[in-house]
């Protein structure tokens, strides 16, 4: 059977000029994969009315999506809390630009049926289905039969608050989870040999912590037939686990996020207020050197997830460590920076109550061993 090498990166925001430059540090790893997948965080449009239910992200230039193709990305997931920030026009312009650049997409569309439909990928004769769901709201971003938006899984907050990214989300709606599971089964029945589920989930800007719903929801995707589950949204790495022999990356952190929309020194009042308020809400002060990526200081540790399949069977799981250079550019990490990423992943897994990952450095990646019960320290 052919070998299938899948590499996944986290959130992508390419507001700044020269997007090829910002992606150049990770492009070699993306290009070398059989399939490379990322999460597109914001609409790429110059049109549309701002959504009022969340702090709206500005639309990025549609022509910047060509840089994703240049960097080697084959597909993007779209179901997230910002994809509808410029309304239906913003979604349509994003889909059009992705199509023009030959980038497959899933998770947002002009109605809910299209948003829930998988992106179909193929490499070496192996058919891969990619599905994408927003688990954090806002509800106004969710697609309906008559409204553009994203595919979603409803997660109810504590105390009946509105479903929104900053809410204390805890309780997955069984009907929503059932629809996701049916999507996975439908993809299998339609011929998917490998199925990947991407979940926009979790708590932003806080190290290690997983919301109560995150692990059960990822497990449900595997129970339905997913071979790989990837998470994003937190803008900081989350831990890893195997469930029934299938890898779950609970949060890939940032793939490449370079934007001035998170600066408190800007003219947009709600974005400037959010940039100030999030520091107070989440208890961190960004490193002033990271002017285009003012996230939690621990967000400098990143990774590209890598899973190798022998045909339809996963045979190796691991990651390529990333480091973010000021003002926010990701690069493949080596030496002490790579060691720091490995040690950080071990620590956040333990802090989140996940099994301690057993890491082995190989020529191809940092491999995560699935079935070891005792692991010697990888690094000093």
Residue ranges and their predicted role:
Residues 1-380:
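Acidic, metal/ion-coordinating pockets
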